[in-house]
């Protein structure tokens, strides 16, 4: 699931909840769900700038997103950047899983979007 804000060129910066392979998600045996913000511009410098803007304001978002939020290189693609967290091997039989993912994604949007 992806959520975009702003002009079409801003689509390279978005919020996303996605399944990622265990090989790139630390602590997972089968897979993980990644939730958060992504900067996926073709130029690494643009991604670094997007992340730098958020890192400059980390004192404002860290208390709300917590220590699980990682600001750094994108999982599986070093030129992209992220502020996101992973949930290793979530229980797919949990009837609240989709709701919990959606709520957490909205928390990232609510906290980070005003700072971008």
Please identify what each model-predicted range represents.
Residues 71-97:
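Short, intrinsically disordered low-complexity segments
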């Amino acid at each position: 699931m992806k959520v975009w804000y702003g002009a079409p060129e801003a689509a390279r910066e978005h919020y996303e909840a996605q399944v990622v392979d265990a090989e790139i998600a630390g602590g997972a045996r089968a897979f993980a769900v990644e939730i958060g913000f992504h900067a996926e511009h073709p130029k690494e410098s643009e991604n670094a700038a997007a992340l730098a803007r958020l890192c400059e304001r980390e004192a404002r978002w860290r208390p709300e997103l917590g220590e699980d939020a990682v600001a750094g290189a994108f999982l599986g693609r070093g030129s992209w950047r992220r502020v996101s967290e992973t949930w290793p091997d979530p229980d797919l039989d949990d009837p609240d899983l989709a709701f919990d993912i959606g709520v957490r994604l909205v928390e990232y949007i609510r906290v980070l979007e005003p700072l971008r």
